[in-house]
Amino acid sequence: MGYLRAHAAQPISTEHRRALANRPTALAILEQCNGVVFAPTAEPLECASATYRMGYGDAGPLVQQWSRWIRRRLTVVGLCWEDEYWFCVDDDGGCFVVGGHQSEACMRGPGTWVETIAALMDGVRLRPVLEPWTWSVVSYGETYRWWDRRVWRP
């Protein structure tokens, strides 16, 4: 995951925190993960595209296109679980994860990873699938913890 670390954004500024004051849910989600909060200038999906391409074929162009669409709606980006995953929160408080194993780590939706991202962009609210190694996540006013061992479907 050196690629992600090398392209990490600067920690979120005080001004950006003030701008997010009316969106406490986004910050609460990220603080639940690791408390490492970044501004959305990190372009997380483009940073992760090299890892994705290695494992799943030449997905770079698709990932970058989704990155451009998603970045317009990003509120904050967090780096979590030993720097391996980007935890992103969009303007509506929705959240999703990208990282080295994106098809498993992203929000679970109907179809492939890119179809899941497309659903996010269309405003479909997806619930996370939590694995035993993930942290508790607060999303849409509900708390999910790994020991619940529940699989949520949209």
Feature roles, as predicted:
Residues S136-V138:
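Short, highly charged C-terminal tails/helix-capping segments
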